[in-house]
Curated annotation (Swiss-Prot):
Belongs to the RecA family. RAD51 subfamily. It is linked to Breast cancer: A common malignancy originating from breast epithelial tissue. Breast neoplasms can be distinguished by their histologic pattern. Invasive ductal carcinoma is by far the most common type. Breast cancer is etiologically and genetically heterogeneous. Important genetic factors have been indicated by familial occurrence and bilateral involvement. Mutations at more than one locus can be involved in different families or even in the same case. Mirror movements 2: A disorder characterized by contralateral involuntary movements that mirror voluntary ones. While mirror movements are occasionally found in young children, persistence beyond the age of 10 is abnormal. Mirror movements occur more commonly in the upper extremities. This is DNA repair protein RAD51 homolog 1. NCBIfam families: PRK04301.1, recomb_RAD51. Forms linear homooligomers, giving rise to a RAD51 nucleoprotein filament, which is essential for strand-pairing reactions during DNA recombination. Interacts with BRCA1 and either directly or indirectly with p53. Interacts with XRCC3, RAD54L and RAD54B. Interacts with the BCDX2 subcomplex RAD51C:RAD51B. Component of the homologous recombination repair (HR) complex composed of ERCC5/XPG, BRCA2, PALB2, DSS1 and RAD51. Interacts directly with PALB2 which may serve as a scaffold for a HR complex containing PALB2, BRCA2, RAD51C, RAD51 and XRCC3. Interacts with RAD51AP1 and RAD51AP2. Ubiquitinated by the SCF(FBH1) E3 ubiquitin ligase complex, regulating RAD51 subcellular location and preventing its association with DNA. Ubiquitinated by RFWD3 in response to DNA damage: ubiquitination leads to degradation by the proteasome, promoting homologous recombination. The modification Phosphoserine is found at residue 14. Changing residue 192 to P: In MRMV2; uncertain significance. The nuclear localization may reside in the C-terminus (between 259 and 339 AA).
Amino acid sequence: MAMQMQLEANADTSVEEESFGPQPISRLEQCGINANDVKKLEEAGFHTVEAVAYAPKKELINIKGISEAKADKILAEAAKLVPMGFTTATEFHQRRSEIIQITTGSKELDKLLQGGIETGSITEMFGEFRTGKTQICHTLAVTCQLPIDRGGGEGKAMYIDTEGTFRPERLLAVAERYGLSGSDVLDNVAYARAFNTDHQTQLLYQASAMMVESRYALLIVDSATALYRTDYSGRGELSARQMHLARFLRMLLRLADEFGVAVVITNQVVAQVDGAAMFAADPKKPIGGNIIAHASTTRLYLRKGRGETRICKIYDSPCLPEAEAMFAINADGVGDAKD
């Protein structure tokens, strides 16, 4: 009798565990969805049941060969596999306490972020050139591979580079600092160069397929907005630009929700040249407007300090107080500033 209860308890926990990890799209076939329809979903970029459950019906109907009735059936089956209803704040609090934080390499910066870069959400870093945005990205691409007890995420990193600033040599220097094998670290980083805004979005579909295959802890887009500044120009194209950017950020948020990866994006700043700039203490503001502001969970403002020191300020966060921390850019990545 005790044995049976134990087995039932084990079965319950395994069901619970399954409901939290991303489930491959092939699970829908077991629920009576036609194999051809599942293939169509996969070709359209839906690689997990979660991706289907989180998608609006309109998106499924746009797939060639999926009628409204089929879309309804697919969404109904996906909803059975993915818990999307209400839960108590206690349960949610429990789930939040299990969230992994990835170290930035600087103790002061980690303290400011209450542990590091949070997985399952979008962290945006913005600032002028030479403020350390890309250096933090390079350091994170290595620290996310560390064991959890050393402040890592025990997963691979994915790096989408839009400005051609990715340097594997920097990763090797950071790997040496943490006593990791350089070749293993480089093997665990998937790198892609994005050449235009459509390509940048297309890469996220590939990212989703790769995340199903192996465990990724971090997705970096450096910089998320650079190509939007050149592909769309003038006020006439502003609305089209913001819609495209909103779609890109929505996909990033979906990847963070689906796979629990930490998404880190960098953003550039624009100088305000209107009359109001004369009265502002700092006339620079991040580009992308309200759309990027609402999509990011945590926004960090980086600025130059003296010498190699940089200052990071929490610009916007749902739970972190507005505060500042100093860090330094060293030969072996981001570290603490020396007094």
